[in-house]
């Protein structure tokens, strides 16, 4: 059995947490047994030390354990970004999800309202008139019938309300929770396309996905700073296939050359 005092002392001494330690401290957060100041101290200490894959995996497993699941009968994909790139693009991943669904791919889209950008996937769908407050069975039905279902993160990860105040106090600084949204899909999507906020986070995300058993994934970050594949700059890519990490960098889909404005 671990304790908060042991965990925070280890982090302050710049020691990485094991998966079990990370699971314990994150589960304590989600259960509401830690105060806001204790949660903040852990998140800041993780940032100061530098987050490692075992910590991401431990936190992700704790989130997955208490999430409200969506059961699907076919393989599903998800495409999303971590957010936090500071560029404030429109919500590209939701557009990509629509195109994928229209081409016959089963998409289980996991998302939220905007936190660090102008528009989150939930904002797009809400403004389009979609009902975000669907039961897991209804989400599964949508996926089966129209190839697209949306899982509004606050409904499927209700324990996240226990860390909201601490995250808000730390903002605009990113925390380990920026990494967790894409890898805690309630439908357990085994095929994923994930954009990350910084090139330095690519291997962290890829290693975490492999440890969590994701069968296929692409992790990317564009060289103009977006958690997207850019049409203005080359994009660095890491592919995961059958638990093997394949580094393919850079990749180019340039349509415009600098200094073309992003808008």
Name each model feature, range by range.
Residues 14-18, 31, 48-55, 117, ...:
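Catalytic cores of large soluble enzymes that bind and process phosphate-bearing ligands
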Residues 76-117, 176-178, 182-185:
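Glycine/serine-rich anion-binding loops at beta->alpha junctions
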């Amino acid at each position: 059995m671990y304790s908060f005092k042991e965990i925070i002392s280890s982090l302050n001494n710049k020691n990485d947490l094991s998966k079990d330690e990370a699971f314990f401290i994150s589960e304590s957060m989600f259960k509401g047994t830690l105060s806001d100041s204790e949660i903040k101290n852990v998140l800041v200490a993780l940032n100061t030390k530098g987050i490692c894959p075992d910590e991401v995996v431990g936190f992700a497993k704790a989130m997955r354990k208490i999430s409200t699941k969506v059961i699907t009968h076919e393989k599903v994909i998800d495409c999303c970004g971590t957010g936090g790139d500071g560029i404030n693009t429109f919500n590209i991943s939701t557009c990509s999800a629509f195109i994928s669904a229209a081409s016959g791919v089963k998409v289980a889209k996991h998302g939220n309202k905007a936190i660090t950008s102008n528009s989150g996937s939930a904002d797009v769908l809400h403004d389009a008139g979609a009902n975000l407050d669907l039961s897991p069975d209804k989400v599964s039905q949508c996926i089966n019938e129209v190839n697209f279902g949306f899982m509004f993160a606050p409904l499927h990860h209700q324990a996240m309300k226990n860390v909201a105040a601490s995250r808000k106090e730390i903002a605009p600084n990113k925390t380990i929770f920026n990494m967790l949204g894409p890898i805690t899909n309630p439908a357990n999507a085994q095929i994923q396309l994930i954009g990350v906020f910084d090139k330095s986070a690519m291997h962290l995300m890829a290693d975490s996905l492999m440890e969590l058993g994701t069968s296929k994934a692409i992790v990317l970050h564009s060289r103009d700073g977006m958690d997207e594949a850019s049409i203005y700059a080359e994009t660095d890519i890491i592919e995961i296939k059958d638990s093997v990490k394949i580094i393919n960098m850079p990749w180019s889909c340039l349509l415009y050359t600098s200094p073309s404005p992003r808008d």
